[in-house]
């Protein structure tokens, strides 16, 4: 399925590593700051008969066990969040699958943005992108997939986003999960919140619910005012931040269900959610 070569119809491909949560932070920094390998492109001097690898046997997603028993608890959490901030305007953001599977995208000639079979991808959008593959994606085309009007984050005291949902690591559906805030103009991720920071965050809202340990709540704001469960969004410099009037979106990644050793099944997880709050006019 990989069409290598130099012709106009040859594929461009990449191998991407996304390390996180190093046990030894200094060793991790050393690894990131010093390229640990070199990649060579080797072209034979003589033409040879192709002997391509077979398509690998895929690990099957899903166990039949779902997170849907937590739907009532999640609705209680939603109501608790809305009640806590009932003096503010609340806009509930949509959630959908962020990318199609790689094999689906290859067969349809659409850009799947490099998905991994070992993960589930969600984002705050109404639908999954299905744009044609091109050498240099025009990210403005993705505006059609964003909420309308666009979601921005100003610096007003009572303007923020609450991200909440089921902690897929706590339920056993993933071994690692995060969410990332992106600027929609350049798809610049400005910060990732990992599942290690989810623990205990829902108990404040559901103190008497024993299933609160399977849920999480996290705040995104311009000024967190000391809140330990809050990500403070920078405005720059450049792609290191998101402007006050720049549209944004949130994306979630959940990796590797232990029982299957591949990505969770979308049909077995409860989708993560987000609510934008701002002052009532």
Residue ranges and their predicted role:
Residues 1-281:
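A compositional/structural signature for long, glycine/proline-rich flexible linkers
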